[in-house]
Amino acid sequence: MADSKEIKRVLLGPLFDNNPIALQVLGVCSALAVTTKLETAVVMTIAVTLVTAFSSFFISLIRHHIPNSVRIIVQMAIIASLVIVVDQLLRAYAFEISKQLSVFVGLIITNCIVMGRAEAYAMKSPPIESFMDGIGNGLGYGVILVLVGFLRELFGSGKLFGIPVLETVQNGGWYQPNGLFLLAPSAFFIIGLLIWALRSLKPAQIEKE
């Protein structure tokens, strides 16, 4: 029987209290690479959430049958299989987005969040709790990704999901797009500001010197 309190903790905790990017500083590379557009940020969020949830679920199911000496290999094999499925689905049904995400879908295999939850939680917890933990951490990762993608696309090109929101000077409007937001360093600054804002609201997350 699944523990409802534990499910609530693992599902909601990673959103703000224990965010994978803002607190644990994991998965930052893909956060820089796929957030120039809100659309790619949302798709990457869905992909990572599904892979993290299902890999944790399957690893938890067989955790008592995995020899300790090969557990990392087994975890990576399960994660890689799920990533291949996600990649093929994107190629089949969202080819343009698949091209934009490029190698970063494949690199979900080595994403610290996915591997970390498999090793730290799924290997020690029941399947349902592990699945919900995967959902929670995927969404926690996605909250930061979507916020960064929102700001970068809006201020970098005046669009959201490719639809003009701020009328640009080139089209007779008032907004001059800020090209800096389309460069990778801007994502560093935005993530840094989000971490600062979150830790200002939750002082307990500030590291002790």
Curated annotation (Swiss-Prot):
Entry's Gene Ontology molecular function annotations: oxidoreductase activity, acting on NAD(P)H, quinone or similar compound as acceptor
EC code: 7.2.1.1
Gene Ontology BP terms: sodium ion transport
Catalytic activity: a ubiquinone + n Na(+)(in) + NADH + H(+) = a ubiquinol + n Na(+)(out) + NAD(+)
InterPro entries hit by this protein: NqrD (IPR011292), NqrDE/RnfAE (IPR003667)
GO CC terms of this entry: plasma membrane
Keyword Signal assigned: no
Compartments where found: Cell inner membrane
Membrane topology, from the record: Multi-pass membrane protein
Pfam families: Rnf-Nqr (PF02508)
Sequence intervals crossing the membrane: 42-62, 66-86, 95-115, 131-151, 178-198
Keyword entries, A-Z: Cell inner membrane, Cell membrane, Ion transport, Membrane, NAD, Sodium, Sodium transport, Translocase, Transmembrane, Transmembrane helix, Transport, Ubiquinone
Biological function: NQR complex catalyzes the reduction of ubiquinone-1 to ubiquinol by two successive reactions, coupled with the transport of Na(+) ions from the cytoplasm to the periplasm. NqrA to NqrE are probably involved in the second step, the conversion of ubisemiquinone to ubiquinol.
Family from the record: Belongs to the NqrDE/RnfAE family.
Subunit structure: Composed of six subunits; NqrA, NqrB, NqrC, NqrD, NqrE and NqrF.
PANTHER family, per database record: ELECTRON TRANSPORT COMPLEX PROTEIN RNFE, NA(+)-TRANSLOCATING NADH-QUINONE REDUCTASE SUBUNIT D
Protein name: Na(+)-translocating NADH-quinone reductase subunit D
Species annotation: Serratia proteamaculans (strain 568)
